[in-house]
Amino acid sequence: MATTLTRLELRDAVRQRADIVNSQFITDAELNSYINQSYFELYDLLISKYGDNYYVAPVYTITTDGINDQYALPSSPAFYKLLGVDLGLSNTSDSFVTIRPFEFIDRNRYAVPNFQSFYGLTNLRYRINGDKIWFTPIPAANQRIRLWYIPRMTTLSADGDTVDGISGWTEYIICDAAMKCMQKEESDVSVLMAEKQMLIKRIEAMAESRDVGSPARVSDNMYSDFSFPSGSGGNFGGG
């Protein structure tokens, strides 16, 4: 089976798997909906493996105005989940430091006027707030802030739209959508259910080790770009 499949190819494969090739009990429009819902499941399964970055949008840059503390999240492609936030050390330098999030209960803890030292020490923090990203304290004007994020899944709206199964993982979409078809028919889905569970185990095992040469480690939450020179998080902004 090809790694990349179109919506039409997925629909044909689902009909074959559910043994409804010549049946219109489930229309193409309904089956397209099932396929998209199953694709959503696969997408979430992959991005839940944070750090493997299967779906990462181009970096999004915010330039602050010195007035507002909240800025709209990216809309093209639409924002889904945040991977990280960086603060530029100057308007001309490509040097950045990592900004840490704050808990809502700590919304006033960092509210003293923002500053940066030569080494980029800062008390700036962020928080996702609805469809905006909220910074505290109000950042100074003309600061560059980069957002690394996962976009929302693009639904399959035409028969020529494709899904990249990466390593045959489109089989998950086919299996799950076929289950939905058979559930509507009130047919036994136990075989497909068992197959789906095996697919989940396989995807979880293989998706996690994308960089087999340098596998991911447990993150050091005590480390901070804000602390100089040790990075231990013990200086201003470290927590």
Residue ranges and their predicted role:
Residues 1-239:
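Glycine-enriched, solvent-exposed interface loops adjoining structured elements
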